[in-house]
Amino acid sequence: MRHYEIVLLIHPDQSEQVPAMLERYKGLVTAAGGKVHRVEDWGRRQLAYLINKLAKAHYLCLNIECSKETLLELETGFKFNDAVLRHLTVVKSKAETAPSIMMKAVEREESRKAPQPQEAAA
């Protein structure tokens, strides 16, 4: 089995259904004997250019280990799911389990937006 990193751009109106989509895709991988090493929800972000007249999309990143047949089944599901605007699959040499650079940036943005304890007391 090979290691893959999959990045999905989900329609922003379908953000509520992202957890169910993740569970379905993770279940598909594990049912076929694969492993899910990392799942990251990067949230709703600005697109560099319009896709289907949309300026934002919900980003997801999955690092999985599965067979080629399972990957083809996943990609077919992405193509026929109207909520998936784009997907990108990259072959990796090993399993990635550490947080990605994007996830660190998301965490940094969230910590900056959260009110500081000193400000809340004032």
Swiss-Prot record:
Pfam families documented for this protein: Ribosomal_S6
Domain of life, source organism: Bacteria
Keyword RNA-binding assigned: yes
Record has Magnesium as a keyword: no
CDD domains: bS6
GO molecular-function term, one example from the UniProt record: small ribosomal subunit rRNA binding
HAMAP family per record: Ribosomal_bS6 (MF_00360)
Family the UniProt entry places it in: Belongs to the bacterial ribosomal protein bS6 family.
Protein name from the UniProt record: Small ribosomal subunit protein bS6
Gene name of this polypeptide: rpsF
